[in-house]
Swiss-Prot record:
E.C. number(s) listed in UniProt: 3.1.-.-
Alphabetical UniProt keywords: Antiviral defense, Cytoplasm, Endonuclease, Hydrolase, Nuclease, Toxin-antitoxin system
Compartments reported by the entry: Cytoplasm
Source organism of this protein record: Escherichia coli (strain K12)
Pfam family name, one: RnlA_toxin_N
Name recorded for this polypeptide: mRNA endoribonuclease toxin LS
Chain coiled-coil ranges: none
The keyword Cytoplasm appears for this protein: yes
Disruption phenotype: Not essential, slightly smaller colonies on minimal agar plates at 30 degrees Celsius. Strongly reduces RNase LS activity, restores growth of an enterobacteria phage T4 dmd mutant. Altered mRNA half-life for some cellular transcripts, including an increased half-life for an internal fragment of 23S rRNA. Allele rnlA2 is due to a premature stop codon at residue 33. Sensitive to high concentrations of NaCl, sensitivity is eliminated in a crp or cyaA deletion mutant. Increased levels of Crp and thus increased levels of cAMP.
Length: 357
């Protein structure tokens, strides 16, 4: 029997309280209290029970490197506390137990810097140059909210880009922005988080034919980069690899929606510029974003609808992926291929509509 270690886990901090409450509710247990850890150490304390037994106390410590340690031995009911500890442990994508250490080829500093700068547009992401010599430049990417970090090293003489760290928020943001620059081999690596891709990828022409069928009349209008991303993603998706988590296989669709939506809006007199981004143009009166009246006034109803629908889908799925929070109609994990393909199919429809509306 394998003995679990509850130290230095790659738990998604934004989900810990929600997961704890849902576990206790589903078990018909009772919450005594949930709140910040007493004392100076960052974390969460969960105290709960069920009728006829002592209180269980679970302390969840937020470590300085972005990892989390669970301590369930504090309270009077250790066995009950371990139930919650095990539940939180099992929310971790098995691929996230290990550190990422992968190498991508074909990079120069002028191609890496824009990706770092675009990643830093996320409110919780910062990057800095850590070291530089004649052979290597090293950058550190840090999440100020989640405390995880990623080390990105450019080996100048070989053109190799090395990515090292935990596959948490910094990894997701950086590789999302990097995706448009990657060839099929590189995209496969970052999507399935393995140095040597284990998916038997589908041939590009097969994936391209599939994409032509999906896009129909919109296919000839696809931007070169958009077609590259979607075909590369389909090479992996259509191989149906057996993975513990499929959320990153939605990268190509989200990148494409972002690019096509920016292009469409710019053509309609709504350029999307940083730092404001898309937010300048949309209101959110309920669960969906809609174009503000002053920008919608000159557009046809079908244009307003698809632009609003596209941004709502992009914002919801991207926010969940980057910030790892619980969002309506989205979750951190896409646990099966059917769910992934459902989201991808919806994305393809949005991309098609953006081109033909």
């Amino acid at each position: 029997m394998t003995i679990r270690s509850y130290k230095n886990l790659n738990l998604v901090r934004a989900n810990i309280e929600t997961e704890s409450r849902q576990f206790i509710e589903n078990k018909n247990y009772s919450i005594q209290s949930i709140g910040p850890m007493p004392g100076s150490r960052a974390g969460l304390r969960v105290v709960f029970t069920r009728p006829g037994v002592n209180l269980a106390t679970v302390d969840i410590f937020y470590n300085g490197d972005g990892s989390t340690t669970i301590q369930y031995l504090t309270g009077a009911n250790r066995s009950l506390g371990q139930e919650l500890a095990d539940h939180l442990f099992e929310t971790i994508n098995p691929a996230e137990f290990e550190q990422v250490n992968m190498v991508l080829q074909g990079f120069v500093e002028t191609s890496v810097l824009p990706v770092l700068e675009l990643s830093a547009d996320e409110s919780h992401i910062e990057f800095r140059e850590h070291s530089r010599n004649a052979h290597t430049v090293v950058w550190k990417i840090i999440s100020t909210s989640y405390q995880d970090e990623l080390t990105v090293s450019l080996h100048i003489t070989t053109g190799k880009l090395q990515i090292q760290g935990r596959p948490l928020s910094c990894y997701r943001v950086f590789t999302f922005n990097l995706a448009a620059l990657l060839d099929l081999q590189g995209l496969e690596k970052v999507l399935i988080r393995q140095e040597d891709g284990k998916a038997n990828i589908v041939q590009q022409e097969v994936a391209r034919t599939y994409l032509q069928t999906v896009m129909a009349d919109a296919y000839p209008h696809l931007h070169v980069t958009a077609e590259k991303l979607l075909v590369s993603g389909l090479c992996v998706k259509l191989a149906a690899p057996d993975l513990p988590d499929y959320c990153m296989l939605l990268y190509p669709e989200l990148r494409t929606i972002e690019g096509v939506l920016k292009s469409k809006m710019s053509g309609l007199g709504m350029p999307v510029q940083q730092p404001a981004g898309f937010g300048t143009y949309f209101d959110k009166p309920a669960a969906h974003y809609i174009l503000k009246p002053q920008f919608a006034a000159t557009l046809r109803p079908e244009q307003i609808n698809i632009i609003s629908t596209a941004y709502t889908f992009f914002n919801v799925e991207r926010h969940s992926l980057f910030h790892m929070e619980t969002v309506v109609d989205a979750s951190r994990m896409i646990s099966d291929m059917a769910r992934l393909m459902g989201k991808a199919t919806r994305a393809w429809g949005i991309i098609k509509d953006l081109y033909i509306v």
